[in-house]
Amino acid sequence: VSKDLNILAENRDALLLAEVAAWLHDMGKCRDEHIQMHAYDKTDNQSYDYKKHYASILNNKDFLDQEIKSKQKLDDKIYFVLVKDLIEKGKPNSLKIPEDNILIKLLGRCHAAAHIEKEEAKDEKTLKAEINKKNDLDKLIQKKKNAIVKKRTTINELEKKGIGDSSKINKLKDEIGSIENEILEFQKNADAISFKLRQVLQSKDNTWISTPFGYEYEKIENLNSRLKNIPFDKVNDRKEIIKSIQEAFVHALGETRRPTNEITLDDWSGIVAALYKSSLAGLLIEGESELDPRCLKWRFLSVRFNSEDIWGNSSSIPILLARKEWMETSLDNLKHLLEETYPLGNEVYRDENGSVFVVPYIEESEFNKALKDLIIEKMPYDGEIQVTPTVQDKSWCGQYYNYKKHPEKNEVPPISSIISGDIPSISANPNDVENWWKGKRCSICTVSHLRPADSRSSNRNISDYWLKKVTGRAKKWKEQKESTIWIDEVADLNGKICLLVGKLEISGWLKEDGYIKTLPFKSPDKDGDYKKFTKEQSFARISRVWRTTKKFWEEVKTNDLDKYRINKRIKVFAEFKPEESNKLQINNSYEAVSEDDIRFTIFYSGNNEYIIIENLELIAKKIKSKYRDTDKKAHELIKEYSRGRNIKIYDPNGKKRDKPLGSLQVSDVISEDANYVPVIPILAEPSIFMAIVPADKALDISRAIKKKYEEEMGKVRNRLPLTLGMVFAKSHTPISSIMDAGRRMLKNTSKEQRWEVKKSIEDKDPCTSNNKFHTLKFENGIEWKVPVTMRGGQIKDIWYPYFYIVEKEDEKPNGREKSFKGPDGWLVHASEIEDGDILRILPSTFDFEFLDSSSRRFEVYYDDDGKRWDKIKASRPYFLEDLDEFDKIWDTISNALSISQIKNIMHLLEAKREFWSVGVNDQVFQNYASDVLSNANWKKKPQDNDFAQVVDAAVSGKLKDIIELYMSVLKISENGQNDDGGI
């Protein structure tokens, strides 16, 4: 290890404590009083300073007096500072104080560099003036009301004495009327100011956290208790204290005012801490006592590789998950190396293809080489992957220290170029591969495809190295069993699974002058430079984008799939009788075959105990097909069937898969309580989601994702497209083929389209959540309900729901108050879209494919327009909104036509389509399709609109896909529908 890096290890404790102090430098914002102080309805006598009063409720304040101190002198100086001073003084204005400690100045600079940008601060004087004006008006109104009370009292006294001069009383009444008119005018002005303030300031009892896409999802409450629960006596235990800080700060805000209420205190503090830690590391390495904090710069260090090369060719789910865990463990090791062992910086981004760290800007090439060598040494992936760390050439300062005078010098952290850049393929270390094979003559390991399959303790072609990892993964499952890693447990009643894939295209939000610059922080100036009134692309805000999208997929993985829980598993007690000298390996799965050829999958957990790892309903269906129907529950039927039987055991992944290893003599079968979701999550990263789900649940889950997307991203859906894909297959289809098809779907990126508005409608009535919408009906049949208010429906959203408009790109749109010229043309607010407008849309789509064979995956291929290359499937992918239409059309035909009728209609239509070589807008074929459907023997003919929808679907080819999906893939027609034949 180089001397430069050793100095970081020597100062580890000081660096990690400084990092914790940076995490806590704005801890005063995690207080209920802070929310109340910045509300429009705060009480007049309320006083709270988050930099002074933050610790008043804490039970333990000793940590504030801890000293952060360098181990050695740097240019004859020992650097030290108290945690308390960092928290209270580490602000951007510390740069203006000559005598301030450089450690405090560095934190102030890092605070500014990562800044939320406080865009509203540019109008801070105006806002304060409005607040003062409102207060003055309130006082004046009260003064006038007091004057009225006084005059009315005088009138009452005069009238009681009976000596009132009518002229005097009338004069007083006239004065009261005049004052009341003044009050009305003052109140009108005060109400107007209140309305403006409420557009920005939130209520003390109703302050919400927003996503960067304008969805307000959490009401802030109980901050004091959250802050008090942080274990401040553990500030020297980095892992525990930061975890506790994050758990508290994720419920607080860096800024409460709209529309900058999208950065949580967790997002904000984490970025400041990362910058501060790396700046101190740079100070130690460079040893510059004359360092000017204003000139601080940073770089990104990344380790990127194509993860698909690691787990994409896995032959089973346990192998896939073991490979994925192996990859992630090495990234965790890298994180520990750079964050704790040699505290150089922090991981600020991770996805399926690696990690990105923020590190100090150090020009010395020898240091950077030593750093790369250390990373290669510490995360070698045991020779299977050669890691290539990259220190980005471009340095950046974030927000320029004097940004008010020189905003052009702000530098957006160029992380998007890393994330969206080419991902290097992986390669093994040839020397290691050569050593593995010395003196070996055997098959190749089917897990790594590199090592020799030298395991003597397994019947499978696997190396000892990977046997331990794969069986170790299964052992972990056996100990918990709160989830599943077995494909057959996921399969539906028809033995089918679905790989559900999804992608949120966030690259446009991360790049310079990207979609963040389409979000105003105040009413846009139509004639002004968009850079002056749109949000800044601060590090904190960019970070918030990928954290939000990652959270979206994580919530899909947990919340949306939770309702499919299974509550029973079956355990079999049996004695294994081997054929030849075969053995069963503990923590392995095998195929069990009964005398009457009922097959299912079991897991050997040791001590003659086996667990059935297959959908119990599917096994029961197999049993019922050979015997009479029964009303018994699946687990009861299987127990009754299995007791006392002799069951042959096969290893489908073994070297002799066609020969039985032996047999099980079953002595007892019991059912166990279980609590697992039959879903195997694979990826839930910022821009990508993969999970294996039961085939018959895939559409329900897709609809739930669509609903969640429309609710949470509805204001920016034209700029943040969602891609969904469903790859259906039988449960024993090679998982590598299924994964390949899913990856192919995700490679199809959304292409910008131009949609003409048929009808723009302002919805008068709010929905059940009181939010208000603006409906856009497009000529292509798509309908969007765009949210145009913030949470609760009382505050108009003037910040998020904007659309790029085509026909007015080069000229100012007439009569559109809420419009401005953005980075790539004119943007108009959803509420001001008019009939006939042409909008630029990045559409969301969904696609599906059934792999009846592994080679079918090659048909998932797209042309330059994003459509399937295969002419038969050229209608795919469909707009995401068509998911609802698929359901509606299927309901229309399945409830009124028999299975045979549907099949016969499709045969007539598709045969004629092929024979006539039907093109686009073929009126003859349109008439033919209408006639065929009209002449069908409907049980009840659909309404005209529904019938027209079915005809249009038949002409476009959509009906063929709907029938394939529902009848051929999902087998919905097998649910006992009567079949009377005919057309």
Mark where each language-model region is:
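Regulatory and interdomain segments flanking nucleotide-handling catalytic cores
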Residues: 1-983
